[in-house]
């Protein structure tokens, strides 16, 4: 016997093996092709920003959402030669807001940043002698 149970926001449906093997008779509702927020990504067809895009990771709706929207909008619509150079104040306001919520917007530690900068330099040092040796060998064989 099949039955359904609601637990908070979840709806749990229990079915028998026979119910599960029977083809579904559910009718799918076609998506509204005029829905401006459906499957368009970050930029809507009209050029506006889709603040509901999952690609923004919820930044537009967090405690600094208004500051994020202001900075992002300024950058998106910027017509300066160096895009976004006219948005320093908006980005500064967003950064100040984010610093008030370090648990939600973790700052990159200076130590982590230095480590990341050192790694490419160390890798370049490791490969440099190999490349130099290969060049000398090529010159000797010519």
Curated annotation (Swiss-Prot):
Q: Where is the composition biased (Acidic residues)?
A: 106-115
Its annotated function is as follows: Central component of a redox-sensitive mitochondrial intermembrane space import machinery which is required for the biogenesis of respiratory chain complexes. Functions as chaperone and catalyzes the formation of disulfide bonds in substrate proteins, such as COX17, COX19, MICU1 and COA7. Required for the import and folding of small cysteine-containing proteins (small Tim) in the mitochondrial intermembrane space (IMS). Required for the import of COA7 in the IMS. Precursor proteins to be imported into the IMS are translocated in their reduced form into the mitochondria.
Subunit-structure text: Monomer. Can form homooligomers. Interacts with GFER and forms transient disulfide bonds with GFER. Interacts with MICU1. Interacts with COX19 forming transient intermolecular disulfide bridges. Interacts with COA7 through transient intermolecular disulfide bonds. Interacts with AIFM1; the interaction increases in presence of NADH. Interacts with NDUFB10; assists NDUFB10 oxidation, folding and import into mitochondrion.
TM annotation in the entry: none
Q: Which UniProt keywords apply?
A: Disulfide bond, Mitochondrion, Oxidoreductase, Protein transport, Redox-active center, Translocation, Transport
Position of motif Cx9C motif 2? Answer: 87-97
Q: Which organism is it from?
A: Homo sapiens (Human)
The effect of residue 97 to S is:
Strongly affects import and stability of CHCHD4 in mitochondria. No effect on interaction with AIFM1
Q: In which tissues is it expressed?
A: Expressed in all tissues tested, suggesting an ubiquitous expression.
Q: Where in the cell is it found?
A: Mitochondrion intermembrane space
Where in this protein does the record put region Disordered?
A: 101-142
Q: What is this protein called?
A: Mitochondrial intermembrane space import and assembly protein 40
Disulphide bonds annotated for this chain are: 53-55, 64-97, 74-87
One GO location term (cellular component): mitochondrion
An annotated Gene Ontology molecular function: protein-disulfide reductase activity
Where is the organism placed in the taxonomic lineage, from the top? Eukaryota, Metazoa, Chordata, Craniata, Vertebrata
Query: What ranges does the record give for the region Sufficient for interaction with AIFM1, renumbered to this chain?
Result: 1-27
Motif location (Cx9C motif 1)? 64-74
């Amino acid at each position: 016997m099949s039955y359904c149970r609601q637990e908070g926001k979840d709806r749990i449906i229990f079915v028998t093996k026979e119910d599960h093997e029977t083809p579904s008779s559910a009718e799918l509702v076609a998506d509204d092709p005029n829905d401006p927020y459906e499957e368009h990504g970050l930029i809507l067809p009209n050029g506006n920003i889709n603040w509901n895009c999952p690609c923004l990771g919820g930044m537009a709706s967090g405690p600094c959402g208004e500051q994020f929207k202001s900075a992002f909008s300024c950058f998106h619509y910027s017509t300066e030669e160096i895009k976004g150079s006219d948005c320093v104040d908006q980005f500064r306001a967003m950064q100040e807001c984010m610093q008030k919520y370090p648990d939600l917007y973790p700052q990159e530690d200076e130590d982590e940043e230095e480590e990341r900068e050192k790694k490419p330099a160390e890798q370049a040092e490791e490969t440099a002698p190999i490349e130099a040796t290969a060049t000398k060998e090529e010159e000797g064989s010519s």
